[in-house]
Amino acid sequence: MSRLSIFPDETAANAPDGLVPQLESNDPAVIQASLSRRGIGFEQWPAEHGLPEGADQATILQAYADAIAWVQRDGGYFTVDAIRMTPNHPDREPLRRKFLEEHTHAEDEVRFFVEGCGLFVLHIGSEVLSVLCERGDLMRVPAGTRHWFDMGSQPRFCAVRWFNNPEGWVAQYTGSSISQRFPRLD
């Protein structure tokens, strides 16, 4: 079940007894409204295409072709791919370290979770919003939004990704250590 937790950004440094969220909800309507007020897109789509376990990129993209085309037209994204992470992926540890550092992008970060889950953490103004995304969740993080992503120490997810940069995922790291002070996926 998807979950949103909102913390003040200074909480981690000042809370000896741990972090206490200002808001915590599993209600999709509350999640969508709370994120929308902060300029973040969140939708839940059916993920019912009955893909075979370990489906390759071509199979995934074909199964979701209509939805992918709609998002491409709506956002002007001309590149799309699918990423699959598993506990035995050879690059899981370096990728996790890279994704866990607070960063921004010059373009929107748009992800649809075909299976599994991941934790997007957004640093917006004086708040930190932790969004557990699961199968069927679509997140749109606007360009320039400070954030990090945790796929967990034993990742298991597949997500469709949209880009308007032909180079794909390109991060500008902020140099902040804030991501080390907030809860992770596991």
From Swiss-Prot:
Q: Name one GO molecular function term.
A: nickel cation binding
Cofactor note text: Binds 1 Fe(2+) cation per monomer. Binds 1 nickel ion per monomer.
- InterPro entries, per the entry: ARD (IPR004313), ARD_bac (IPR023956), RmlC-like_jellyroll (IPR014710), RmlC_Cupin_sf (IPR011051)
Site positions for May play a role in metal incorporation in vivo, renumbered to this chain? E102
User: Which reaction equations make up its catalytic activity?
Assistant: 1,2-dihydroxy-5-(methylsulfanyl)pent-1-en-3-one + O2 = 3-(methylsulfanyl)propanoate + CO + formate + 2 H(+); 1,2-dihydroxy-5-(methylsulfanyl)pent-1-en-3-one + O2 = 4-methylsulfanyl-2-oxobutanoate + formate + 2 H(+)
One GO biological process term is: L-methionine salvage from S-adenosylmethionine
Needed cofactors, names only, are:
Fe(2+); Ni(2+)
Site positions (May play a role in transmitting local conformational changes) are D108
Q: Where are the transmembrane segments?
A: none
Q: Which Pfam families match?
A: ARD (PF03079)
Q: Which domain of life is it from?
A: Bacteria
Entry EC no(s): 1.13.11.54, 1.13.11.53
EC main class here is: oxidoreductase
UniProt keywords (A-Z) are: Amino-acid biosynthesis, Dioxygenase, Iron, Metal-binding, Methionine biosynthesis, Nickel, Oxidoreductase
Tell me if Nucleotide-binding is a UniProt keyword of this record.
Answer: no
Quaternary structure and partners: Monomer.
Q: What does this protein do?
A: Catalyzes 2 different reactions between oxygen and the acireductone 1,2-dihydroxy-3-keto-5-methylthiopentene (DHK-MTPene) depending upon the metal bound in the active site. Fe-containing acireductone dioxygenase (Fe-ARD) produces formate and 2-keto-4-methylthiobutyrate (KMTB), the alpha-ketoacid precursor of methionine in the methionine recycle pathway. Ni-containing acireductone dioxygenase (Ni-ARD) produces methylthiopropionate, carbon monoxide and formate, and does not lie on the methionine recycle pathway.
For this chain, the family text in UniProt reads: Belongs to the acireductone dioxygenase (ARD) family.
**In its UniProt entry, what is this protein called?**
Acireductone dioxygenase
Origin organism is: Synechococcus sp. (strain CC9605)
